[in-house]
């Protein structure tokens, strides 16, 4: 049995290495050993939120695992026979639902199945669920991947309680994604939400984002507002630009003492920054597409080459050898090109 050995402290050395490594192990059937997990972080080793994704992939692939405990700095994952399932991931806190899906989606794309995940939908240090639904899944659909995703309930820090359900069909036709630079913006859209808070919070976030986008661009702006109940209060906004290529996004979370207007402008400014580079994908999307691009092929212009992106490319190439060519420096716009897609 030949192991794929991954140094978990490489590059940005975070949970991304775990998510991509274990997902690729399930897809390829190759066992993976990850050592030095988060070695450069203040609290090294596996965190609870990483375990949720790993255990979901274990269930999906009937895997044998060793070292799957909080604080563990080495993990061995030996996948069994993967089969379509309904995977339930109950995160008791505000652990990120979208980060669990970053681990699950690449593997499930090859198998099919459905999922039900509770936890945080809109939490710091992870993509908001509306970004995943409207920006990431839009790009995946262009590559031939069909995912249905429904946000049943929001979950914010610290209590969580969000619920996201969905299903994914097996990836039949792998379509190369060619999207270097956008040429025109068709329109802007977005979702501004307030949970256990007054409706005016969502409305003010939306108004501020709408006004900021309209200062810079003439394309129409339609931002929906959503007011809901859950375990605890929270607010946030995701805005995206529909271009002739892909969608680029920007987002921001509300917090106590931060005016709703600041939240709305922050999301709009993040999107404007990405659009100004002229590239077809924002920095978060570029990074998220890597495991899928390896199989579909193509080339994508990203608004910023990030450490996350470079690390993710490195993990994919640990499994398949030279797959990508990355043009551009970290911190600058660049291009991601598949030189040898994996079949």
Swiss-Prot record:
Which GO biological process categories is it annotated with? Answer: RNA processing
Positions with a binding annotation for ATP: 102, 284-288
Q: Which UniProt keywords apply?
A: ATP-binding, Cytoplasm, Ligase, Nucleotide-binding
**SUPFAM superfamilies, per this entry?**
EPT/RTPC-like, RNA 3'-terminal phosphate cyclase, RPTC, insert domain
Task: Tell me where in or outside the cell this protein is found.
Answer: Cytoplasm
EC main class here is ligase
Active-site positions, per UniProt?
Answer: 308
Residue stretches spanning the membrane: none
Q: Which InterPro entries match?
A: RNA3'-term_phos_cycl_insert (IPR013791), RNA3'_phos_cyclase_dom (IPR023797), RNA3'_phos_cyclase_dom_sf (IPR037136), RNA3'_term_phos_cyc (IPR000228), RNA3'_term_phos_cyc_type_1 (IPR017770), RNA3'_term_phos_cycl-like_CS (IPR020719), RNA3'P_cycl/enolpyr_Trfase_a/b (IPR013792), RPTC_insert (IPR036553)
Major localization listed first in the record, in broad terms: cytoplasm
Supply the HAMAP family for this chain. RTC (MF_00200)
This one is known as RNA 3'-terminal phosphate cyclase
